[in-house]
Amino acid sequence: MSPQQEPTAQPPRRHRVVIIGSGFGGLNAAKKLKRADVDIKLIARTTHHLFQPLLYQVATGIISEGEIAPPTRVVLRKQRNVQVLLGNVTHIDLAGQCVVSELLGHTYQTPYDSLIVAAGAGQSYFGNDHFAEFAPGMKSIDDALELRGRILSAFEQAERSSDPERRAKLLTFTVVGAGPTGVEMAGQIAELAEHTLKGAFRHIDSTKARVILLDAAPAVLPPMGAKLGQRAAARLQKLGVEIQLGAMVTDVDRNGITVKDSDGTVRRIESACKVWSAGVSASRLGRDLAEQSRVELDRAGRVQVLPDLSIPGYPNVFVVGDMAAVEGVPGVAQGAIQGAKYVASTIKAELAGANPAEREPFQYFDKGSMATVSRFSAVAKIGPVEFSGFIAWLIWLVLHLAYLIGFKTKITTLLSWTVTFLSTRRGQLTITDQQAFARTRLEQLAELAAEAQGSAASAKVAS
C-alpha cells in the first residue's frame, strides 16, 4: 500500500477590504489600515488623489495640477497591504459581496469582506445637465484645466475681435454659486484680470473685464453666517466683482445666462465664460445601494447611513464622505477624513474581537470652515470664533499646506503661492488649443470664421 500524503493546511485567508474612491475618504481609510491584518484593494476612476479645495487655483493659473494630484499608487507605494486598481465601478453586488468595475471595455469582479464606499460627488445642475456643456463645474483636474483654457482663451479672443458686443461678451465672466468655491473663483478671476494680465494686451484692457457672482440665495457664504458673508462680499466688491443675489439661473447657453430675479424679473447676461459651483450630486452608486437594500437617499442622492456609517442590513458596508448623509456632518474634506478613519478603526477593532453590535456611533469634530477671497484676505470660522482678513488668510494657508501630501508638494506649492501673492505673477498660464476651445470648439471656430467674413465684406464695401 502506497503511503498517504498528509493534507497540507491552507494558510488562512486575510480579511479583504475593498475601498471605492481615492479622495480624502478612500485614501485616509487605506492609510489607517496600514498595520491591520487585511488585504486592501482600492478602486478609483483616476490614478491620482485630488486635493479638491485647491482646484480653483489650477483653474486660475496659480499652481499646476501636479501639485494637488499626486499619483495614488505612489502615495501608497510603501504600504504593502494595498493594491491600487484603476477602474470605473459600475455595480456593487451586496448579496454576493462583490464590486464590479470596468476599464477599457474589460469587466472585473472584486470580492470583499468589508466595503468602504467613498466615491464622492459630482456637480449638480438641478436637473439641467445640458448646462454642463456651457458652464463647467469644478470637481476634477479635467474641469479645472478646461476652465483655465476657457478663461484665458476669452481674453485671447477678445484681443482679436473687432466687434464691441462680442468683445464685451468675451470679457464677462459669470460664476454661478456664492459658496466657498464660487467666492474663491470669482475673487481669483478678478485678480487675474486686474493684476496678472494688466498691460499684457494691446487691443483690450483686461482690467475692464466684468466678473459676476450669481446666487439664488440672499447672501454670500450662507453656511458661514451673515457677518463673514458680508465681509467676503465687501472684499469681492472692492475687487470689482458684481454680486447678484436672489438670482436664479433658468437657462445657460454658449453665449450667456438667463436669470430670474426674486421679484420675478427675467433678464439675460451675455457671457462667454461661465463657471458652475452651485451644487453637488452624490455618486450614482448610492442609487445602486438603495435598489438592493433598505437604505434611503436624500434629495442630493446621498446615502442615509446608520450612526456607525454602515447601511441597514449590511454592517460590513460603509459609506463615507460626500456620498453619506449624516446629520451635523458637512460635505467637506474633514467629514470624509474623520469618517474614513472611524470606519477603518471599526474594522480593525472587530478583527481583534470587538462585537459589531456594540459599535460606538461616529462623532464628527468640527474643525471650522474657511474660504479665501483674494490675496492676503480670507474668512474663517472655527467654532464660535470668526476671523477675516489677513489673519484668516494665514490660518487658511497653514492648514491647506498641512493637508497637502508630500514634502516636495508642500514646498513647490508654497513657492508658487509666494510668487503669486507677492508679485501677482502666475506660473501656470499656459493653455493648449484643446483646453482653449474645450467642448465648444466647433462652435467657437464657426463664430470666428463668421466674424472674419463679416470684416472682409466690410473692408470690400469700404474700398
Swiss-Prot record:
Biological processes annotated in GO: aerobic electron transport chain
Membrane-related topology note: Single-pass membrane protein
Binding-site list for FAD: 21-25, 89, 322, 333-334
Gene disruption: observed consequences: Deletion mutant is attenuated for growth and virulence in mice. Deletion of the gene alters the NADH/NAD(+) ratio, suggesting that this enzyme has an important function in maintaining the redox status of the cell. Mutant shows growth defects in vitro and is more susceptible to oxidative stress reagents, but not to potential NADH dehydrogenase inhibitors. Was considered as an essential gene in vitro, but later studies show that ndh is not essential individually.
Cofactor: FAD
Active site: 184
MF (Gene Ontology): NAD(P)H dehydrogenase (quinone) activity; NADH:ubiquinone reductase (non-electrogenic) activity
InterPro entries tied to this protein: FAD/NAD-bd_sf (IPR036188), FAD/NAD-binding_dom (IPR023753), NDH-2 (IPR045024)
Activity regulation comment: Inhibited by phenothiazine analogs. Inhibited by 2-mercapto-quinazolinones. Not inhibited by classic inhibitors of type I NADH dehydrogenase, such as rotenone, piericidin A and pyridaben.
UniProtKB keywords: Cell inner membrane, Cell membrane, FAD, Flavoprotein, Membrane, NAD, Oxidoreductase, Transmembrane, Transmembrane helix
EC class: oxidoreductase
A GO CC term attached to the entry: plasma membrane
Major localization listed first in the record, in broad terms: membrane
Reactions catalysed, as given in the entry: a quinone + NADH + H(+) = a quinol + NAD(+); a menaquinone + NADH + H(+) = a menaquinol + NAD(+); a ubiquinone + NADH + H(+) = a ubiquinol + NAD(+)
Textual note on the cofactor: Binds 1 FAD per subunit.
Annotated compartments: Cell inner membrane
Entry-linked SUPFAM superfamilies: FAD/NAD(P)-binding domain
EC number(s) recorded for this UniProt protein: 1.6.5.9
TM regions (residue ranges): 387-407
Family: Belongs to the NADH dehydrogenase family.
Function: Alternative, nonproton pumping NADH:quinone oxidoreductase that delivers electrons to the respiratory chain by oxidation of NADH and reduction of quinones. Ndh is probably the main NADH dehydrogenase of M.tuberculosis.
Name of the protein this chain belongs to: Type II NADH:quinone oxidoreductase Ndh
Provenance organism: Mycobacterium tuberculosis (strain ATCC 25618 / H37Rv)
Lineage of the organism: Bacteria, Bacillati, Actinomycetota, Actinomycetes, Mycobacteriales
